[in-house]
Amino acid sequence: DANRYRIGLTNKEGLNVKRFSISNGISPRRIALLNENRLKQAKMITRVVQPFQLQKALEHVIANKGSAGVDGVSIRELRKVFSEKKLQIIEAIKQGNYQVEPILGIEIPKGNGKTRLLGVPTTTERVLQQAVAQNLAPLFEPEFSNYSYGFRPHKNARQAVGQTREYIHSGLNHIVDIDLKNFFDEVDHCLLLNLIYQKVKCKATMQLIRKWLRAPIKINGKLHKRRKGVPQGSPLSPLLSNILLHQLDKEMTRRGHKFVRYADDFSIYCKSHNQAKATRVVIEKFLKNKLKLTINEEQSGIRKPIHFTILGFGFVPTYEKGSKNQYQLIVSEKAWKKLKERLKTITRKTTPATFEERIAKIKEVQRGWLNYFQGTSILGKLRDLDGWLRNRLRYCIWHHWKKPERKRKNLIRLGASQDHAYAWSRTRKGGWAIAQSPILGTTITLQRLRKRGYVSLTELHLQLNPSLCEPPST
């Protein structure tokens, strides 16, 4: 029921407004604009289901790829399936009897050994949610804070890191780092719907959003009810999270705090430890009491820049004469570990892929990672990682040769002596030990790997940073 989310309007004196009038502090022109906006908002669902809006949403979902939901319809099949069901879906939405599909729950590993539950809507639901997001965003986006960088047009993680560095360089080096525990699973539905209703008066749209929020989740074949949280695999989730956490941004702005927020990852920058302590108490109270969110006490704290990381970046002092409170960016240990894990997955011997397919995936990961961390001091660690990665590729080739006789022939073809080739092809050593041995280092050389498409991280880094004059690793 839309009345459940109705919020009373107030005039500039803070008094409730029952009738628009000049005496209540609202001009006739303002009344006309408000009424016009309300009329547009009341008809939002008609815009959501317009053919060009649905087509735009469809193309967006296809471009983002992703896995199938509970109905098993893949991205490849989506265009055909959606065109067949589109008219039926539109009519059901307009009539208010559209039934949403359950969400598929998939557990994905986190860096700390734990798992995160990802809620994946069906591909059809993702198209509809994207269409709603396209119409909701213009209403909320203009009011969002300039210091909110996550999931917003013309905003990105590097801008958030740059703003953080600017704060630190200005002397705000006592950082309140608050970690929200399972934020996406803890979002209060009633609170979120109330915030949306302040801008959206369309009953059908509100009803649709509420159904998506309450859709059950299917985990290991069993359906579970959901009474809070937003599914992380939904196209609507980023916008909904920003709508809720915009209340936090407003509170921090009202109090004059210097902050940076990227989705649910936020930090506040203070001049002194005492100021940081007081700020932490107030903001944690606001999060618990007003937004009904849980704080991860173990991961939260007040930190100095050298003990603080944000979005994969860390900070170290420059130690240059006359550069007090100046820091340079480094890559955090967690980000290095994550890169190595991704490369390890691609080069796992049991992963069914040709050598060329592995190289293509490695290049994609390398370019994305190096572009993101461009401008950091990483050459030394890149060289170590390159040596490890080349051995992983040699291991893949060795495993691909399989039988001892094939291994012997290939080693001879690549320049090994008859005796060495025979001995190594029959060795009892494990594949990883052989990959690091001289026999593969002198046969499957760097030059031969390059001929098959391999490019080292060091070489790519130097291409992206031509000002660095250190020679590439050989």
Regions found by a protein language model. Give the residues of each.
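Core structural elements
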Residues: 49-54, 102-104, 111, 213, ...
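A glycine-rich phosphate-binding loop feature that marks nucleotide/adenosyl-phosphate handling sites
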Residues: 299-308, 361-365, 382-390, 405-414
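Short, solvent-exposed helix-loop connector elements
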Residues: 117, 225-230, 328, 344-358, ...
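Extended C-terminal regions of large enzymes
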Residues: 392, 397, 401-474
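Non-catalytic, polymerase-adjacent accessory regions of viral genome-replication enzymes
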Residues: 1-83, 87
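Short amphipathic alpha-helical coiled-coil/interface segments
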Residues: 82, 86, 283, 386-393
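Conserved polymerase palm-domain catalytic core
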Residues: 92-107, 111, 143-307
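A conserved non-catalytic segment of reverse transcriptases
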Residues: 214, 290-355, 360, 365-367
